[in-house]
Every structure is written in structure tokens, then in C-alpha cells.
């Protein structure tokens, strides 16, 4: 896991806030929200592969949404009761970066919607 000082140098203030302070970018503001290219979405902090473009869908929420992740063992899931809501937070298992949340209202085949901050991801085009 990278130390906080190194991450502050590497990341933009928004990327740091989202990944290290469990922040949330404004809806429809992220550069990956409407990305339609084929490729892999990686953790911006440690470069691990998290999501594939084949599982991305338009949810209308304003954040990149995926119905599945590449490897459930690569993501940590924990209950988040902040903001007077009960949600499931998702973070990168390798480095602990906050990614977003997962909700049980996605499309088939999983019925899940991983609602992920663009600021926590980088995209590698195929």
C-alpha cells in the first residue's frame, strides 16, 4: 500500500479525496462516466484491474456503473452507514482505495450496480 504522502503527489486533489477520504465526485462530472471504448478500468492508486467495459452500462446516475467486477476477490465490501443511509462500500482490496458503492438494482445477469467514481479509476483501452 502506498503511503499518503506519495499518493498526494501522484493524485489530483479530487482523486485523493475520493480514494483516501471516501469522497464522492459530483454526478456527471467524471471523465469516465460516458466512456464507450473497449478496455479495462483499473485502480488509479495501484493499477490493479477492477472492471471490464463489457460489464459497463448506462444507469442514469451520473457515475460509471458496472453489473460485475473482474474479480470479487480483488474488491473489499463493507457496510457504510454514513449520510443516514445503509449501503455497501466497495474498495480496492490491494491498496484500500475507496471506489464507490454496490447496489442490488442493476441489470441481469448479476442484478448488481457497482456505482464507481471516475476519480478512482484509470482506463486502459484495448
Q: Which ranges hold each PLM region?
A:
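A short Gly-Trp-Pro
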Residues: 1-126
Amino acid at each position: 500500500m502506498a503511503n499518503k504522502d506519495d499518493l498526494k503527489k501522484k493524485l489530483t486533489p479530487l482523486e485523493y479525496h475520493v480514494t483516501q477520504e471516501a469522497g464522492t465526485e459530483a454526478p456527471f462530472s467524471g471523465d469516465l462516466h460516458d466512456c464507450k471504448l473497449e478496455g479495462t478500468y483499473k485502480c488509479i492508486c495501484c493499477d490493479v484491474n477492477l472492471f471490464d467495459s463489457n460489464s459497463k452500462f448506462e444507469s442514469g446516475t451520473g457515475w460509471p456503473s458496472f453489473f460485475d467486477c473482474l474479480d470479487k476477490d480483488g474488491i473489499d465490501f463493507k457496510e457504510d452507514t454514513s449520510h443516514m443511509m445503509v449501503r455497501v462500500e466497495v474498495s480496492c482490496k490491494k491498496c484500500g482505495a475507496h471506489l464507490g458503492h454496490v447496489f442490488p438494482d442493476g441489470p441481469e445477469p448479476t442484478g448488481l450496480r457497482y456505482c464507481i467514481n471516475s476519480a478512482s479509476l484509470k482506463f486502459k483501452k484495448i
